[in-house]
């Protein structure tokens, strides 16, 4: 079998595109490029420094940093030294979360940014196996076992001055397809997350697979706005672009995490990317900002914008096969006019060169997809998971259908199975099971979970879906299906998305039914919107009358989905919440209720609010006008 490691991929691109800009970074007033050949020089220097430090083939190194050139160069340098990267999320705030990963992964060396160093220092005494902590930024002083990256580079120069280059390169070239590249810990899956082992060939295979769905050329640029520890950001964010000689930028690092987030829209506009990776939470924020900008122009602008959207929705239909076809062709002049008057100006806020978004992390609401498509910057939904490196399918310029997760990457085998593992015919819903070179090597030091998840080369994803007309439709977690008292199973995610999307006074919501007499919901209200509604009736949330009316407002918004409501055709009544619990605080990363992609961690929410769920199945709790809901408001 031909050897195709990440090092091979990188060396091939440097050879073909030496003068192309590879990495872009903004530390001052503008983004500055570093070419492929220059990045290679820096990688050699740093990799040789790691070897000089004592890093050996098979050692595990952790990387904890904001997105920046040093992150990508650092990972490549690890590979040239023969090491495996354990990328860590900067959103890990709890010392125990970091400590578990570092100890569980047998980490010997840590690369860390100056901003994140305090987290390592807080647990350093509990990490006796860690030999050195390499700080990516220059500090006034360093503590025990700490050293600056500049010293590693100095050591690398000395090493390369003494040893033949071929001797150093032989270390990286000794890596094979099955050697480990990363051990990633997807957040929010269990109390002690599993370490997903991805090999060099897992990554290069998924790059090849993804390029069967999306075309990229060497002039393209992307700004990676997702955390680099995600394998989604790894594959689509820089390895696909690297394979094509294209350019990768990272968001300007602020003094705080919030400042870095605020830099995202500014950086997008100035860097002018061709493609951006997104997750639903970011997509919703972008949409919210666009709508706020339109409202700021006055009521006439809002009416015109909404009219333009409606016409765009009709013209585009639900897929590329419907777009502009049949009677829709009559709308083309209007679509072009509105695009010139309105949507082109919106696109300028994304730099003016953006071709499309690729969405991952969680399912994108269908209405959200239609919104961006009407603007002329499609947000194509893809599907994958860390254990598949991660891409399994995606919509794209070649083919898209709103609501689907697109066509399968190639080559890849997929089957849909029932709960007993029997293969189901096309169109029937069951667990998505895949086989291909992108399937992980296993879970680190967890053979039992590996055996449960990968069977004879087939990865059991734990997600529910079906195939239709060559497209994959993902319905949600197979293992988080709600089960009615009659044994009927249904996926909650689509219902939850719709309830939040169409209910202005509900910010977050999860459904619950575990063979219970009826479905219930735990929800986080939008108190600001409730106050505005109440103000029209001279009420507020401080009075009993105001709180009772607020609960009625939420109930009415849910009732829109019931028989007689304007959204009644979307879901069966029995799947909708009979009653609901209003929660006193939102689901956040800080309280552990959402993961780093802003996806609600159902198990943690259910555990934290077990008593509240039990109350919903009492006579008092079944009535939404209960004391607990009033207290929460």
Show the residue positions of the predicted features:
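Structural core segment of the AMP-binding/adenylate-forming
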Residues: 53, 80-156, 559
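Conserved ATP-binding/catalytic segment of the ANL
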Residues: 422-427, 431-484, 625-632
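ANL superfamily adenylate-forming
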Residues: 118-176, 290-343
